Design a protein with these regions (language model features):
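Extracytoplasmic ligand-binding site segments that recognize negatively charged/polar headgroups
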Residues: 83, 88-211, 215-228
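Ligand-binding "clamshell"
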Residues: 98-105, 127-131, 242-253, 315-318
């Protein structure tokens, strides 16, 4: 019997030792995870020095992963199996993710610095009261042009139809963007669901065909930077990168109407470290950090405290910081259901096929 007790005691001792090792390893892993932040963002969309600064200030290591489209980001988070703590989707995707319960409602008792964000960038239709997102960058859809290749600068959407721009215009390859500029040129909302307005818009876009050089996406940068196209319809962030590399380029936002876009910080349901997520959001809300990020990326900051620290020529540039009157005429893309997404896509596809 003593041998049995000794044997059982030995087994128990081994179990306790193994449990202790397992507990120690789990504690180390949990401790390491609690000191790690996983960010899911667009490529080259943050100053790398800010990530280093965040780690220095908080002790939290950053794992930075990138995506190249909102759809790719959505799919990966929707499928699960990821541990992203913070993501940076665009406004229409925030709406979609919110409706599909993929985002964590924000706890504003843990957020510091929201007062630095301009009120004009808050409480947008895609996220009322900013229940799920905090503005990161914003911008517009407009016209970039080469002043050495046009006699008169295009300032309005209607200008694109001028005969002197034959085979000169690069359009962004997007249904909402192209149909939107057509709708705006006729005085309609870029979110129109009026069949008559859409028919009128498509007819007018067909008339633009002789002026279109190509319908492209990222390739537009190369064309414009290398003086291979006179005019492009693109987003302000893309335009700022083009202007930086070609002094002949200018960017203008048609004052009659255009698109206002946002990329916002959210906490996905995949979050593993909420404390680190809030720490990062608060870090990016600090004016000095938002300023550094805006100067590196070249996009417009929604942080008004940071904007005040920008060079005068930058913050007074109405192309990237439009005045209040222009802002009144800008619209975000409203989320379309499957039916209307299909209608816009079909109309755009028909337009592209026609011009060939």
């Amino acid at each position: 019997m003593k041998r049995l007790y000794s044997f059982l005691a030995g087994i128990l001792a081994i179990i306790l030792v193994l449990w202790g090792i397992s507990y120690h390893l789990d504690s180390k892993i949990n401790s390491r995870d609690s000191q790690k932040l996983v960010i899911y963002n667009w490529g080259d969309y943050i100053d790398p020095e800010l990530l280093e600064k965040f780690t220095e200030e908080t002790g939290i290591q950053v794992q930075y992963e990138t995506f190249d489209s909102n759809e790719a980001m959505y799919t990966k988070i929707k499928q699960g199996g990821t541990t992203y703590d913070v993501a940076i989707p665009s406004e229409y995707m925030i709406n979609k993710m919110k409706d599909e319960d993929l985002l964590v409602p924000l706890d504003y008792s843990k957020i510091e610095g929201i007062e630095n964000i301009g009120p004009e960038f808050l409480n947008q239709s895609f996220d009322p009261n900013n229940q799920y997102s905090i503005p990161y960058f914003w911008g517009t859809l407009g016209i970039v042009y080469n002043e050495t290749m046009v006699e008169e600068a295009p300032e309005h959407w209607d200008d694109l139809w001028k005969p002197e721009y034959k085979n000169s215009i690069m359009l962004f390859d997007g249904a909402r963007e192209v149909l939107g500029l057509g709708l705006n040129s006729l005085g309609y909302s870029l979110n129109s669901k009026d069949p008559q307005q859409l028919e009128e818009t498509v007819d007018k876009l067909y008339e633009l065909t002789p002026n279109i050089k190509a319908i492209v996406a990222d390739e537009m940068k190369g064309y414009m930077i290398q003086n291979n196209a006179a005019i492009g319809v693109t987003f302000s962030g893309e335009a700022s990168q083009m202007l930086e590399k070609n002094p002949n380029l200018k960017y203008v936002v048609p004052t009659e109407a255009s698109n206002l876009w946002f990329d916002n910080m959210v906490i996905p349901k995949t979050v593993k470290n909420q404390d680190a997520a809030y720490a990062f959001i608060n870090f990016m809300l600090k004016p000095e950090n938002a300023l550094k990020n805006a100067e590196y990326v070249g996009y417009s900051t929604p942080n008004n405290a940071a904007k005040e620290m920008l060079p005068e020529e930058t913050k007074e540039d109405k192309s990237f910081y439009p005045d209040a009157d222009t802002m009144k005429h800008l619209e975000v893309y409203e989320k379309f259901d499957h039916k209307w997404t299909g209608i816009y896509s079909d109309l755009f596809l028909q337009f592209k096929m026609y011009r060939k």
